[in-house]
Amino acid sequence: MRFFPSFQSATRNFASGLKQQFAGKFSAPNLATPYNSGIRGVWIPSTDCKVLTSKQRIADAMDFLADTGFNTVFPVVWNRGFTAYPSQIMREQFGTEIDARYQGRDPLAELIIEANRVGLKVIPWFEYGFVSSYNLNGGHLLAQKPEWAARDCNGNLLKKNKFEWMNSLDPEVQDFLLGLMLEVARNYPVNGVQGDDRIALPCEGGYDAKTVKRYLQECGREAPQNPREQHWLHWRAGIITEFVARLHRELKAINPDLLLSMSPSPYEWGLVEYLQDSKSWVDKKLVDLLHPQFYRRDFNGYKQLVDRLIDRQLTCEQLHCVSPGVLLANRGSNYSMNPELLLQVIAYNRARGIPGEVLFFYEGLRDNGNALAEALKNGPYAR
């Protein structure tokens, strides 16, 4: 890695220490086991969710999910510029090994142990991707590395929906995030890693001097002021696709059975707004699992996204890798899905040949006296 020459030796030492610390507690993940009945997954965030705050809460959550019928958990490990595991890269680059909330612990290791105990697969979720901060003017990452900032056409720090962005088109920034994801894949017995809808860049970005110069050199034209101009948009989306390809290639070099999971915004909106060409990712076989975020609060809205995906975007042969993201709850808007809608959504997935889904998020299962969990346990997730 260009930004961290001692990466290989450092991660070897780190992994050795980790294995000693948790000797006998990890069991090797069964990477090759296919999802014969589809993914029944759930995201475990650190925002509006207390699961990761203690070993006991982690153990209780894994028991609850296994009893409900889930087979995969996606725990957050990268959020607001900090990791939920002790990171050699973060210590070397930013002097902060782990999120301060978890000082003296390793929530990822604790969760893997408990998930193994009840037979759940673990795919760590890099929620923030190329985002540096939320409403903090770039946060500690860009305070220390201002050259990593993404820029809009006016030269300002790129912000969208209060999120501030690193420049995901910059090779050094790409090396950093890739390093974090491979660090987890090398050092923990996981089933894969997951990128979110922030393995992306808002289309308004890419106007930093380095990227504009690269565009001129490669394409012989100036970057247009219109961020949605087709050539400029697809050129930048291609750089994101190249990053996904590199991530896939280097993940498989660690272990060919490790899964690359991606959860992009719905195509084509994700392409136009966030440079996520998820159709190309699938066409080029760069992802093993795709969880487009079909976060709709009514059945017809969800159905339209599924129909568009199946009828216009993917082939029948590609459908096996798809498990859409389904919105169970949103604390900001006080939304909680009702059991009837959840069962209707899952039934439609199966009717259209979609074998599974990933639910956002864990706490939604516990709302209203575990109403959604009970509906799953007594219905489509019954053993």
What are these regions (language model features)?
Residues 37-41, 49-52, 129-187:
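Active-site-adjacent "subsite" loops/lids of carbohydrate-active enzymes
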Residues 288-302, 320-383:
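Substrate-binding cleft of secreted/luminal carbohydrate-active enzymes
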